[in-house]
Amino acid sequence: MSTTPMAAPPGADLKPVTSSRGRSSTSDEQKLRSSCESCAQSKLKCSGDKPACARCAKRGLACKYVIAKRGGRKPKGYTSTNDNNPSKRREDSHSPAASQWSSTGHLEQSYPYCDPTISGSASPALIAMSDFYNPMDQNLPDAPTSHSDISMDFDFNDCFSLGFPSSNELSDFCNVGSTDMFSPSLDSSSSSSTGPERQLLCDGFSLTDDAMSDLFPLSPPEPQQQISCTPTDKNPHSYQEACLNGSCSCLVEALSLMKQLVSSPARNGAASPPNIQTIIDRNEATIESVRRMLECSCSQDDGYLLSVMSLIIFRVLGWYATVARQTACDVDSQPSRSPQSSISSAGSGYCLEGADSARMAAQLVLSEIHHVRRIVHQLSLKLKAQGEKERSRPETRMEGLEAMDNEMTLPLSATMYDQLDVDLKKRLRALSWEMIDRLRRY
């Protein structure tokens, strides 16, 4: 009995064809993105031209459109098609991995869409930065195409265009005029008054002078006796070298200056009138010596030295006031003379003659105060630092040699240093006011 083979149904022969056609139709339905990969990474609008957009064509970049991602599940044929596509696997093998990043954060090889003119050291991060700093303006110049040309045209010297103040500006800050530190209420109308204003100036000036006179008797120097106050060594580094060698003599020098300023009474018990030439020369030498002692490192730790230097400045200001007052008294006590007569109250260097001698003496003292103002400013900083060091000292109880050493290094209290600072500035201000008042009256 022969059996006749059954014919295959029509749908069976068409099954693989239908499957292949379905996969091809699925791949044909996949759409590309409207923006190329380069414009998408740069967050810029793409013209969408094929095969290369206007931006990539202008910059010489490889324009590539990737498949658009849709929401939902992926089609069944999408995964199998991608897995069976050898070109896709080969393209994925060139994708940057984590191991391909160098220690500096750059890729060791370029992306496939990079221009071949870019060297291998150029990273996509630099390319993205160049795209970010170049907006979508067709009038701008082309971006650099090599790693060596990728640089920001930024001049760092512009950050320092303001510069630092010159030495002349700093010196102008120190050389502030005497009228700048006083109240503008002192006008010419008050110059003729001899009431409470002048009494207030004299009282403020003589506060410390009375206390100093109890310790050191004030007596003018002898006209014929020239006291040498200039140190034997004028080298400004001598004090610093002596401190480094452990043989600092700043305190001894300060005490010697103080002894010379507090001169002994004149012979025969008669006080001779002060000599302007001698006083000004001696004060200038004293100020120079104090300035060099302030530059020494020992002035930062020695409270005794700062105290003695403060007393020296008090005496210098006192001698300036003495010579100005003495000249004014000589002018007031002289009877009226002819224009040919003159009153000489100066030495060979400063000749103050006639009725204007008091005004000239006040002007001379006022010009010398500028040098004292610089010293007072430097000494004020040292006194404040010493006061802060005293305040920062711990409150713990110390005994024996440790407590004795602490008292030797910080002999005075912080309040004492603050008071010396205040008194120095007050004394300098009072002397300046007095000289300005004399200039307005004469």
UniProtKB/Swiss-Prot annotation:
Output the SUPFAM superfamilies linked to this UniProt entry. Answer: Zn2/Cys6 DNA-binding domain (SSF57701)
Keywords (A to Z) from UniProt: DNA-binding, Metal-binding, Nucleus, Transcription, Transcription regulation
- Residue ranges forming the DNA-binding region read 36-63
Cell compartments where the protein resides: Nucleus
Q: Where is the signal peptide?
A: none
Specify the superkingdom.
Answer: Eukaryota
Query: What biological processes does GO assign it?
Result: aflatoxin biosynthetic process
Q: Which Pfam families match?
A: AflR (PF08493), Zn_clus (PF00172)
Task: Please list where the region (Disordered) is annotated.
Answer: 1-34, 74-107
A cellular component term, taken from the record's GO annotations: nucleus
Query: Polar residues bias: where?
Result: 96-107
Q: Which GO terms describe its molecular function?
A: DNA binding; DNA-binding transcription factor activity, RNA polymerase II-specific; zinc ion binding
User: Per the record's keyword annotation, is Cytoplasm included, yes or no?
Assistant: no
In terms of one coarse class, where is the protein primarily found?
nucleus
Q: Which InterPro entries match?
A: AflR (IPR013700), OAF3 (IPR050675), Zn2-C6_fun-type_DNA-bd_sf (IPR036864), Zn2Cys6_DnaBD (IPR001138)
Q: Explain the purpose of this protein.
A: Transcription factor that positively regulates the expression of the gene cluster that mediates the biosynthesis of an emodin derivative that may be involved in black Sigatoka disease of banana.
Name recorded for this polypeptide? Transcription factor MYCFIDRAFT_198930
Q: State the organism named in the record.
A: Pseudocercospora fijiensis (strain CIRAD86) (Black leaf streak disease fungus)
